[in-house]
């Protein structure tokens, strides 16, 4: 019997137009004795539109940086301020556009070809730097088409930020956050808090920032649209993708 299900959002629970399919919503609603917990890179202010489909009194956000259980925040971890500012300086000097997610909102310095489900607040570089000195920062992200640009960001983080790590939520979207946060570590925190053994937990995801969920000793699964790295790691691969109720198939397989 599963006691906890942790699910990624984009590409997993949500379909390609960022919605929860009707059959999936009904399946989650009918879970009896099992907590369904979103485990996402999004921040709390980016998931409010899901409250009619999932119980948001329990959630993992910011790739494990923010954990709420029974409406109580049980874990909250920001990036090192000096390292965050250094990464912004690197971005400015290389004409990159950082996407900065703080405790209050999503900020950006310009909006070239911006495609996002959340409208950011646009600030000048100086305004953004000043804000980071006052607010906690969960993560700094970059969307880049050029693999060499992404590799350069990786190299900078490795060389200069001892408290920061990076991972990819899509092949061209890199997310930089504190080393003590991950979706997998969040599973450890919640399972210990609720005293749920790992063999009663299911983790579901589709991309590389979900990989840390799959080495925790719990059950694991992915939709057919998942990355090859994820497919090589999980216990069960659905024949269905996120546009065809893969979540329903996965839950039925383990229940």
Question: What is the role of each PLM region?
Answer:
Residues 25, 29, 211-215, 231:
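Alpha-helical segments flanking ligand/cofactor-binding loops in enzyme cores
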Residues 54-57, 76-79, 114-119, 183-185, ...:
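Short, hinge-like loop/turn segments at secondary-structure boundaries
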Residues 16-114:
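Active-site phosphate-binding/coordination module
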Residues 90, 94-97, 101-216, 225:
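Conserved acidic, metal-coordinating active-site core of Asp-based
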Residues 54-55, 63, 160-162, 216-217, ...:
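Short, structured coil segments at secondary-structure junctions
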Residues 197, 216, 220, 226-255:
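Asp-based, Mg2+/Mn2+-dependent phosphohydrolase catalytic module
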Residues 2-16, 214:
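Asp-based phosphoryl-transfer active-site loop
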